[in-house]
């Protein structure tokens, strides 16, 4: 778990899925992104990539090859590498591997940056196509 903190907020981000897990408002003395009940839902604010939503029938075809894809892609279920973590900035990266290419045949680097300034948390997603083919994707969170 990575933590960013200033005089207003304490923010926690998991390396698993680069998921925002907690925003604690110090002035209000309350959790803004609550810890859910894992009996019902064990996520908080998942990052969705390379698909948002379901693909028809759980499969899609690219260049004549059929690929399985679960709802909302796979990023939320993968460990991201934390490449920066300071009191006001956290950067996570997920890159394509042999495993991701079994379901998503593209070379990519997906970076999630969270920056804390005052009472504002800014989240930036950057998708880089590191291959030669056109890459189709969507991002959500």
Placement of each model-derived feature along the sequence:
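Surface-exposed acidic/polar loop and edge beta-strand patches at domain peripheries
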Residues: 1-126, 130-141
